[in-house]
Design a protein with these regions (language model features):
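Class I SAM-dependent transferase core
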Residues: 1-72, 76, 89-105, 168-182
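Conserved nucleotide-cofactor-binding alpha/beta core module
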Residues: 52-171
Length: 182
C-alpha cells in the first residue's frame, strides 16, 4: 500500500524526455539513448516492493537514469543518493525532482562503477538495469543487514536477486525472472 501511494505521488511524465511523454506510462522499458533505458513501471514497483525502503533509511540508486525510481523511493526513505553519469539524464532527473518538490534526493554525477563511500554506508542499494555480476565495491557499501537488489543477466534470462549483508557474509535470494535491458 505504501509503495502504491509513493507511485501515485510522482508523475512519470515529469521524468522522461519530451519525445517520450506520450509513452511514459506504457508497460515497456523506454529507450532513452543507444544504451540506456527507463525500466517499465511494474518492474520498478516490484523492485521497490522487494527492497522495502523504510522512512529512516539511506538508499543508493544506480544508475539513476531519469530519477523516476529515486523520486518514488524518496517518499519511502529518508535520503536517496542517485548516481548517474549521463548529463542529459541528470538534467531530466533534476528538473523532475524540482517540479515534484522533492528535496531528499541527491543526484551525483559519477561513473556507475565508482564507489560512493563518502555518502554511505547504505541501508539498501538498487542497481537498475541488468548486470552480469555484483561488484564487491557495492556490497562493501552496505550497512550490516543492508539489502542490495540487482537484475543479474545469465545468457538470455534475467533474474531479480536480493542480497542481504549479515556481518561478514552475504546471503542471496532469487526473487523472480524478468526481461530487463542492460
Amino acid at each position: 500500500k505504501e509503495v502504491i501511494s509513493a507511485f501515485s505521488s510522482v508523475n512519470r511524465s515529469d521524468f522522461v524526455p519530451e519525445d517520450l511523454i506520450l509513452r511514459s506510462y506504457t508497460e515497456k522499458n523506454l529507450k532513452l539513448s543507444s544504451d540506456r533505458y527507463l525500466l517499465r513501471p511494474n518492474l520498478i514497483g516490484e523492485i521497490i516492493n522487494h527492497v522495502s525502503p523504510k522512512s529512516n533509511e539511506s538508499i543508493l540508486v544506480l544508475p539513476a537514469s531519469t530519477g523516476y525510481s529515486s523520486a518514488i523511493i524518496s517518499n519511502l526513505a529518508e535520503t536517496v543518493i542517485a548516481v548517474e553519469e549521463d548529463d542529459n539524464l541528470i538534467s531530466i532527473a533534476e528538473k523532475g525532482m524540482n517540479k515534484s518538490g522533492i528535496n531528499n534526493v541527491v543526484v551525483i554525477k559519477k561513473k556507475i562503477n565508482e564507489n560512493c563511500l563518502d555518502q554511505g554506508p547504505f541501508n539498501a542499494i538498487i542497481i537498475e538495469g541488468a548486470i552480469d555480476y555484483i561488484p564487491d565495491q557495492f556490497l562493501n557499501q552496505l550497512e550490516n543487514h543492508g539489502r542490495l537488489f540487482a537484475l543479474i543477466k545469465k545468457e538470455d534470462v534475467t533474474n531479480a536477486m536480493l542480497y542481504i549483508k549479515n556481518e561478514n557474509s552475504i546471503n542471496s535470494r532469487f526473487l523472480f525472472s524478468c526481461d530487463a535491458p542492460k
